[in-house]
């Protein structure tokens, strides 16, 4: 058993990048961070591609990052798994059952998802593959497009829409029905007014109508509205859903489809509702959403949280709303239930349109709560996520992101001061980069997506002389287990990055 306790501090979206004018982290005032990087052992971690279970060259994201951090192994991600399996989609028993039900009911298929090659929430190629199969079975299809502009350039929707239009013009009975920026269709922060706008367009064709999707997008561009924020709208003569219809959600990441799926199946009540009894998802989105899926998830056991629980130790997960699922559901390998002696605290995120308006977000409240819990000396492991660098970085506003970095720096200073003369070891890392690249020089526009840069890995307040090796996100859990003097389970294929001096 250990004499140490650990605080794992995940600075979401904090990468190591070139020191230039577009690196909000390098440009920000952050005296505590500057001191940390000089005083304590540090290395860096790879957060993309095959190092986290993604295709080579694929940028990492928060879900993938937290799954790898918590599981202590490289977890084959849904993108890779689906890429491998979708070539056999015509034989997928779950899709065949779905299709047979539509045919029996004489309905049409509504297929919805993020039309993007960002690889974070979806892949447009998956949508095309499923459309091909539906067309082969002579199913009439209404396509509901969610527009990205966050994991892709802010003004890039016409590229993907053109690909889709070219693809379906040779297929029978396939029509684009609605468009919606992901700001509306993919909200995850319980801002149901946004989700309702997307739902009303999909379910009731209740929104502004355009003849074709490219005209709809250009109309928004003319108003200065980029892809992410395009209001839900209707395309052509789409008239809405009927009870005999079926619905497929093609996003494979769960957190940003839960609200819209719950509206579709009636778990979130709306003023008007169409009841469908034939809905299917790409993967299992939640234990609380009772719909089948095309590609069932893998079962991940002996995660870091499970090892802590099996040793009868107490652990705490804390984050603000935007990243709460990441330190709980994703960190636990896609399991919603809490382990024994696991406590969770959610701090509400600010209710603003975009986080450049409040770059401090709720970091100070998160920090004050952590300090209260440290003083209890109850928890052997505290896992905290600071959302600022990622969520403000996604706005493309470099000045606001610099303010976000300064806020995090102040929070780190408070935590470090609090753990002096305690047995707490502060482990600092990130899940992926973002704030260190804020401008796309090649395309002369703000850069709002994640990056391929490595992220920092630093251990503070450890009373042993050590060096740290470079590694991958899956190496963090084994490193923490070494600090806690707990055995690493065989399922964890990551390695401790600690080298004794």
Curated annotation (Swiss-Prot):
The family note in this entry says: Belongs to the BPG-independent phosphoglycerate mutase family.
Name the gene behind this protein: gpmI
| CDD domains, per database record | iPGM
Lineage in the entry?
Bacteria, Pseudomonadati, Pseudomonadota, Alphaproteobacteria, Rickettsiales
Quote the pathway field.
Answer: Carbohydrate degradation; glycolysis; pyruvate from D-glyceraldehyde 3-phosphate: step 3/5
What HAMAP family does the annotation carry? GpmI
Task: Extract the PANTHER family matched here.
Answer: 2,3-BISPHOSPHOGLYCERATE-INDEPENDENT PHOSPHOGLYCERATE MUTASE (PTHR31637:SF0)
Gene Ontology MF terms: manganese ion binding; phosphoglycerate mutase activity
Function, as annotated, reads:
Catalyzes the interconversion of 2-phosphoglycerate and 3-phosphoglycerate.
A GO BP annotation: glycolytic process
Query: Where does the chain bind substrate?
Result: 121, 150-151, 182, 188, 253-256, 323
Q: InterPro entries under this entry?
A: Alkaline_phosphatase_core_sf (IPR017850), BPG-indep_PGM_N (IPR011258), Metalloenzyme (IPR006124), PGAM_B_sf (IPR036646), Pgm_bpd_ind (IPR005995)
Q: Which residues constitute the catalytic centre?
A: 62
Organism the protein comes from = Ehrlichia canis (strain Jake)
Q: Write out the residues that bind Mn(2+) 1.
A: 390, 394, 450
Could you name the Gene Ontology cellular component terms for this entry?
cytosol
Give the enzyme's EC designation.
5.4.2.12
Reaction catalysed by this chain? Answer: (2R)-2-phosphoglycerate = (2R)-3-phosphoglycerate
Its name, as the record gives it, is: 2,3-bisphosphoglycerate-independent phosphoglycerate mutase
Record-listed Mn(2+) 2 binding positions: 12, 62, 431-432
Keywords in alphabetical order, please.
Glycolysis, Isomerase, Manganese, Metal-binding
Q: How is the cofactor bound?
A: Binds 2 manganese ions per subunit.
